[in-house]
């Protein structure tokens, strides 16, 4: 059954022009290292990401991972002339994957010279935010205190009972590698400040147990009453929704470099808008607060505003550097509809030259002529993203007229921007290979994973059930006859 599904995928890849590979690894419930291979390509103008297989590995070094990927690619691209089909490979930014000398991407590129490496942009967004938090001590302290809220309520069911009584919802756990959890924690604490204050006061008064809980509840209560903490919480409450939006966009299967450029511009504009509100974030000091005992070291409002400006600048600068479209991804800027009018006045010759060097299968002179026509026509300036422009050209029956543009658009759409599909496959792995089924073979694991991950593809496959029956019927001689003529 698993081989039948793979043969259908092989047939799809045979009919497509370009292919990209996505790979990542994780540890299953049996503590075995599992590497997943996903193939991305176009089917009838729509991008698909097909699960190929899980591969159990004894070692997680670059050579072992590259051999696994090469073994999978050699099955879907068996001929030497097919190697030019592989135009992209997407992994995380670990050195074993991204190393220029001995990394997986460099080893794969030796056999597939057009397979350009893409560092998963969802991972890069996580790195941007980690840099913004770690470089400023006050913000690092703020997130340390903030994570204390979720940690406090994960230690005891009795504490959770107080939380359910006052707040009515649980606090998300803080995870370093998943910044959407950090943003949810910020939003939850901000929206339920009064309820959390009531909860901690209730614990301090009515707790019957260890004094550690009372001491920690008192400390968290002081955080919620601290003016600096609330100011930083207000700032990140304005930032995090935009992070959530971008994080969700980076997990779309239909994401292409051109659309990601628009997402990049929107995110930078949103951060700049929040940056302009920084002087009004910290509330004025009331007479009651001035009469209270002040801490020995107090940070002025000007200094706190400077800190938040610094955090905003760090986010923007690191975001621009990590989301910079250079080398092979510079070709995405050729289809930025907002720049078509400017390109009509001054053609981007340098970007076109870089694109032709990255993808030798393109005819540079013909591509230049076709792009010049697109830049001069108003109807193409309404398209947002490479997918929309490709569909417009196909619906207008212009595939032959703009053959090189179509080819470049297919390359851009096929190029993956994130390895989110690998994370989704790992979720399926946890559901399929559980503690009670931890001794299943790799063939059975891949078969069950294929049925779960690619169920829509299998349902749409012609005569799939009949072919499975015929395969089992011909495996060996049986007493019962499964095939009737």
Residue ranges of model-derived segments:
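Alpha-helical structural modules in large enzymes and assemblies
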Residues: 1-485
């Amino acid at each position: 059954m698993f081989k039948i599904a793979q043969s259908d995928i092989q047939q799809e890849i045979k009919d497509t022009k370009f292919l990209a590979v996505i790979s990542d690894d994780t540890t299953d419930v049996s503590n075995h290292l599992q590497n997943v291979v996903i193939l991305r390509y176009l089917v009838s103008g729509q991008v698909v990401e097909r699960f190929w297989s899980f591969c159990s590995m004894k070692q997680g070094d670059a050579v072992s991972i590259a051999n696994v990927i090469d073994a999978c690619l050699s099955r879907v691209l068996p001929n030497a002339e097919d190697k030019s089909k592989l135009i992209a490979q997407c992994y995380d930014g670990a050195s074993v994957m991204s190393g220029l000398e001995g990394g997986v991407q460099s080893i794969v590129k030796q056999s597939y010279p057009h397979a350009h490496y893409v560092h998963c942009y969802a991972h890069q967004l996580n790195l941007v935010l980690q840099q913004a938090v770690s470089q400023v001590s006050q913000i690092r302290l703020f997130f340390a205190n903030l994570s204390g809220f979720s940690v406090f309520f994960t230690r005891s069911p009795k504490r959770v009972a107080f939380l359910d009584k006052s707040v009515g919802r649980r606090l998300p756990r803080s995870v370093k590698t998943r910044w959407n959890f950090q943003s949810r924690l910020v939003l939850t604490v901000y929206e339920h400040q009064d309820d959390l204050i009531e909860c901690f006061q209730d614990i301090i008064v009515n707790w019957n147990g260890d004094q550690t809980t009372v001491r920690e509840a008192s400390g968290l209560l002081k955080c919620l009453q601290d003016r600096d903490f609330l100011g930083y919480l207000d700032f990140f409450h304005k930032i995090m929704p935009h992070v959530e939006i971008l994080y969700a966009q980076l997990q779309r299967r239909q994401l292409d470099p051109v659309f990601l450029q628009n997402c990049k511009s929107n995110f930078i504009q949103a951060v700049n808008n929040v940056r302009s509100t920084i002087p009004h974030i910290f509330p004025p000091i009331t007479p009651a607060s001035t009469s209270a005992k002040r801490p020995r070291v107090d940070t002025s409002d000007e200094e706190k505003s400077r800190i938040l400006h610094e955090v905003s600048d760090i986010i923007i600068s690191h975001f621009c550097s990590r989301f910079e479209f250079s080398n092979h991804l510079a070709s995405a800027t050729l289809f930025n509809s907002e720049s078509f009018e400017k390109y009509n006045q001054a053609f981007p010759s340098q970007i076109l030259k870089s694109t032709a060097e990255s993808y030798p299968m393109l005819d540079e002179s013909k591509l230049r002529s076709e792009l010049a026509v697109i830049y001069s026509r108003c109807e193409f300036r309404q398209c947002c993203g490479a997918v929309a422009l490709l569909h417009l050209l196909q619906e207008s029956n212009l595939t032959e007229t703009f053959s090189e543009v179509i080819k470049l658009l297919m390359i851009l759409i096929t190029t993956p921007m994130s390895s989110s599909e690998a994370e989704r496959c790992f979720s399926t792995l946890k559901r399929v290979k559980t503690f009670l089924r931890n001794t299943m073979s790799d063939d059975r694991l891949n078969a069950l994973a294929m049925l779960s991950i690619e169920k829509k593809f299998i349902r749409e496959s012609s005569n799939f059930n009949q072919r499975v029956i015929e395969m089992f019927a011909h495996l060996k001689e049986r007493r019962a006859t499964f095939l009737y003529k």
